[in-house]
Amino acid sequence: MPKQSKMSNVAYEQLNQDADRILHLIKVQMDNLTLPSCPLYEEVLDTQMFGLQKEVDFAVKLGLVDKEDGKNLMLRLEKELSKLHEAFTNVK
């Protein structure tokens, strides 16, 4: 069982690193609100979010990550994305 626990920790840590990378993209955009609705940026962000969701789903299916933990990870990113859109509409 300890091996499974270690694998779960490694899997969750990797998901967190990927989430932090996406969070960094969001924060860079929030700091540089010159082109917040840039279609290219939105496409990259959507692709990254989709990819992370698939990673989370896969880790959950393998039993490496708890479904609720994966959901909370995605929720955290979605909240940051919401802040970006809110900041943009307040600047306009």
UniProtKB/Swiss-Prot annotation:
SUPFAM superfamilies: EF2458-like (SSF140404). Pfam families: DUF1507. Disulfide bonds: none annotated. Belongs to the UPF0358 family. This is UPF0358 protein SH1840.
